[in-house]
A protein has these predicted regions:
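A flexible loop/linker signature enriched in serine peptidases of the S9 family
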Residues: 174, 185-193, 211-212, 229-237, ...
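Amphipathic beta-strand/beta-sheet edge segments enriched in Tyr/Trp
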Residues: 39-40, 98-165
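Short beta-strand->alpha-helix linker/helix-N-cap micro-motif
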Residues: 42-104, 115-118
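Residue-level detector of Asp-centered blade-edge/turn motifs that repeat once per structural unit
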Residues: 176-177, 221-222, 265-266, 309-310, ...
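Short loop/turn segments that connect beta-strands within beta-propeller blades
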Residues: 138, 198-202, 242-246, 286-290, ...
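A short beta-strand motif characteristic of beta-propeller blades
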Residues: 203-208, 247-252, 291-296, 335-340, ...
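Hydrophobic beta-strand positions that form the internal "hydrophobic ladder"
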Residues: 181, 226, 267-270, 311-315, ...
């Protein structure tokens, strides 16, 4: 029990150090397959009005199929507050192809884009063929002619893929609507669940459940495996689980603290935290040879490692300066540099893929905000105005 409390304090960013707050955390981990719930996120508009887009119900005899697809596309495109979706009741026409689309009809609604399409059934395979189109009203041109072939069971996935193409065509940025979220639930006393779901909270699946705490889940780079910490055997153990087979393996660990596993970008290593030498330090685990290398050695608490995109550096949290701050260590030279200097609490850092920026939790006036910082530059930028923000991670499209 004492060890569990120590580890919980460690993993959750030193929130019990120099504090008397009790904080509830929600950790969400993202992975893209190219491949909650009940959490409502309210996003307000910025200073610029978002593009207005109409999603016309696709032409098909079975309206339930049509509305399943178009409603899902509408929900996806409105998920981040980047678009204003026009209500179906405000539509002035219901085109299904470029041949029956008239741009002047839509200019009266002050609309930027229209999505329309039609569905047919492939009789020999019973698969749906979805032809969909994206029209730019301002420029008066057809931006996208897309075709999706889908079974009835995969219509939702197809709608996510269509949303990705539409989103990228408009913004120039890859869509992330096929992304999966991984998170831990504690629905009742002595019950913990490690779950994944679609980015909108649908299709929830429990990967592992236990009467003992589960912590620190992380995706492998290829999305085929996950790592996490479980207390199921009375001690903190790091497990790797294969998502297709469900097979679980416990890594060779010492008694004491074993926490915060994170995958390297090539999938060959896990960085993690262990107290095997008497104090929590960062270690590297070679998944092929099972060799363990010590990365940091300090009397302070080192935790929450994160790999840079090139795999040559680790970002980690340490209180070696007296308060939780972010540090960077070269895996080649073992040289350690302090990264953050603003305030007395900066933790849970993650690199952006460009290697030039990091995102992390910053405390200001006893409030916790998601912030970003450019490496090598002074200062930071707070992204959120709420008070108990935790566990940031970068989206698969780096946006």
């Amino acid at each position: 029990m004492i060890l569990r409390k120590i580890l919980e304090n460690l993993t959750y960013n030193f929130l019990q150090i120099n504090m008397s707050l009790k904080v509830f955390f929600v950790s969400i981990f993202l992975f893209s397959l190219s491949i909650f719930s009940n959490i409502t996120i309210e996003i307000s508009r910025g200073t610029e009005e978002p593009p207005r887009i109409a999603i016309v119900p696709f032409l098909y005899d079975d309206q339930s199929i049509s509305y399943l697809l178009t409603n899902q596309i509408s929900d996806n495109l409105s998920l981040f507050g980047e678009f204003e979706i026009i209500a179906n009741s405000d539509l002035i026409a219901f085109p299904s192809s470029p041949e029956d689309f008239f741009y002047n009809d839509w200019k009266t609604l002050d609309i930027d884009y229209v999505v329309a399409g039609f569905i047919s059934l492939e009789e020999d395979t019973s698969k749906f063929i979805v032809n969909y189109f994206l029209f730019d009203i301002r420029q008066g041109r057809n931006l996208l002619n897309g075709t999706a072939r889908s079974s009835a069971d995969s219509l939702v996935l197809s709608s996510h893929k269509m949303s990705n193409r539409i989103y990228k065509q408009i913004t120039g940025v890859d869509g992330i609507f096929t992304t999966k979220l991984m998170y831990i639930l504690n629905p009742e006393k002595d019950k913990y669940q490690l779950n994944i779901c679609d980015i909108n909270g649908d299709n929830e699946i429990t990967l592992f459940d236990s009467p003992e705490p589960i912590m620190s889940p992380d995706w492998s780079p290829d999305g085929k495996k996950i790592s996490y910490v479980s207390f199921e055997n009375g001690n903190s153990e790091i497990f790797i689980q294969d998502l297709s087979s469900g097979k679980r393996n416990s890594l060779r660990m010492y008694p004491g603290i074993n926490s915060a596993p994170v995958w390297s970008t090539n999938g060959n290593y896990l960085a993690f935290v262990s107290s095997r030498s008497g104090n929590p330090d960062v270690y590297l685990y070679d998944l092929k040879t099972e060799k363990i290398s010590r990365i940091t050695a300090h009397y302070g608490i080192d935790t929450e490692p994160s790999f840079s995109a090139n795999g040559r550096k680790l970002l980690f949290t340490s209180n070696r300066s007296g308060t939780p701050q972010l540090y960077e260590v070269s895996l080649i030279t073992r040289k350690i540099s302090r990264i953050t200097f603003d305030g007395n609490y900066n933790a849970r850092g993650r690199y952006f893929p460009d290697g030039k920026n990091i995102v992390f939790v910053h405390r200001s006036e006893e409030k916790f905000h998601i912030s970003i910082k450019r490496l090598g530059k002074s200062g930071l930028k707070m992204l959120t105005e709420t008070t108990l923000d935790e566990s940031p991670s970068v989206s698969p499209n780096n946006n």
